[in-house]
Amino acid sequence: GSSPVGTYEHLVEMYENGDLDFSQVTTVNLDEYKGLAGSDEQSYRYFMNTHLFHKININHANTYVPNGTEPDAEKACQAYNELLHKIGPADIQILGLGHDGHIGFNEPSDHFENETHCVDLTETTIQANKRFFDSEKDVPKQAYTMGIGTIMRCRKILVVVSGKDKAEILKQVIQGPVTPEVPGSILQFHPDCTIIADEAALSEMAV
């Protein structure tokens, strides 16, 4: 989503100032819409290229995003799982938080999915993301997403949350019970998770 855009802007600025070198960095993205090619302006590959990869000295061959053009969901997910196991746990994972508590495209469910899988997007997610498309009917109904188990194996997690509209769900994620109905709540069990939020997003918190 758009939550980390400000983070990417700072990373680009630090690179331009000579403070960061991305030549040895490998990135793995959380998710991609099923059916969208990397050249599609609404794809997450295009988003990452535009906001980060094409502005820094990263080796493009070391930037990985699920293959949205693979119509066979099982094949697409297996390929990404094999890649993730080969690379190993990420040193740092940057997450946003959906209005319904989803992380990546791990939507509210009756169970946590461990590995990369194909998910049917909820109406809440479709409504939240339609602003990026010409019309609501253009929003893909499915996506490939990294699983909760893979996310939890990352060594450090940063969650970026902003806005009053995220206040109630952020409260549930931090102070509510751990449940797959609020996927982000699983982060309570991560040994090194930091949440970066503005005052509006924290306005429902009891401290």
Which sequence ranges carry the predicted segments?
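Short, flexible loop segments at the rims of nucleotide/cofactor-binding pockets, characterized by
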Residues: T69-D72, D134-P140, V173-Q175
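Class I SAM-dependent methyltransferase SAM-binding "motif I" and its flanking Rossmann-like core
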Residues: D100, G104-I148
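Short beta-strand segments
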Residues: G1, N29, P66-N67, I94-L97, ...
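ATP/nucleoside-binding phosphotransfer catalytic cores, i.e., glycine-rich phosphate-binding loops
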Residues: G149, R153-V207
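A glycine-rich beta-strand to alpha-helix segment
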Residues: S2-T7, E82-P108
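Ligand-binding beta-strand-loop-alpha-helix segment within the catalytic cores
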Residues: D19-I92
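Solvent-exposed alpha-helices and their adjacent loops that cap or buttress functional pockets
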Residues: D19-D21, N57, L84-G88, F112, ...
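A glycine- and small-aliphatic-rich helix-loop capping segment at beta-alpha/alpha-beta transitions
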Residues: E9-L20, Y44-Y46, P108-C118, V178
